[in-house]
């Protein structure tokens, strides 16, 4: 019985490389001279420190640009509300999404079952296993899921016949 897995994996090594490139660019750019702007990663969370909202916005653009160069989709970042730090400075936490959370997995399963395609979907931890009688059904599921409005990037792997 053909099957495949729907997963959401994040390459943390590539995120670290992008953060190092952002830090290097911040230290070299003229508009960041004298500014105390940093980006740090601790487990699955980034902390962006900037002098003001304008610098924070520029750091968002830098971070997204460097992630795109490293083939990491910007959808893996979940920006929280910026908060005031000491003086004029601003701090923002950014969660890094890795794996499918339960609500998103349930929503995808519900949408696939509601589509009328003849496949079975099972939640296995932080991934989904989709199996069906025909390979064409599975390819239709992949196209259907790609058409859903999901912020988190998804990968399709272990396609077996």
UniProtKB/Swiss-Prot annotation:
GO terms for molecular function: nucleotide binding. The keyword Cell inner membrane does not apply. Pfam families: DUF520. SUPFAM superfamilies: YajQ-like. The keyword Nucleotide-binding applies. Keywords: Nucleotide-binding. It comes from the Bacteria. One of its GO terms (cellular component) is cytosol. CDD domains: YajQ_like (cd11740). Nucleotide-binding protein. Belongs to the YajQ family. NCBIfam families: PRK05412.1. PANTHER family: UPF0234 PROTEIN YAJQ. This is Nucleotide-binding protein Plav_2177. It comes from Parvibaculum lavamentivorans (strain DS-1 / DSM 13023 / NCIMB 13966). The lineage of its organism: Bacteria, Pseudomonadati, Pseudomonadota, Alphaproteobacteria, Hyphomicrobiales.
């Amino acid at each position: 019985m053909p099957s495949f897995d729907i997963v959401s994996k994040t390459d943390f090594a590539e995120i670290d490389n992008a953060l190092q490139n952002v830090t290097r660019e911040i230290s070299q750019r003229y508009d960041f001279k004298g500014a105390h702007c940093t980006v740090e990663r601790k487990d699955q969370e980034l902390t962006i420190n900037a002098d003001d909202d304008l610098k924070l916005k520029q750091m968002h653009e830098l971070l997204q640009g460097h992630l795109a160069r490293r083939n990491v989709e910007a959808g893996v970042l979940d920006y929280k509300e910026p908060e005031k730090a000491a003086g004029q400075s601003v701090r923002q936490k950014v969660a890094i999404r890795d794996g499918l959370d339960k609500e998103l997995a349930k929503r995808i399963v519900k949408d696939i079952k509601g589509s009328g395609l003849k496949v079975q979907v099972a939640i296995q931890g932080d991934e989904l296993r989709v199996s069906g009688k025909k390979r064409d059904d599975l390819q239709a599921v992949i196209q259907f899921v790609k058409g859903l409005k999901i912020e988190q990037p998804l990968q399709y792997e272990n396609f077996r016949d």
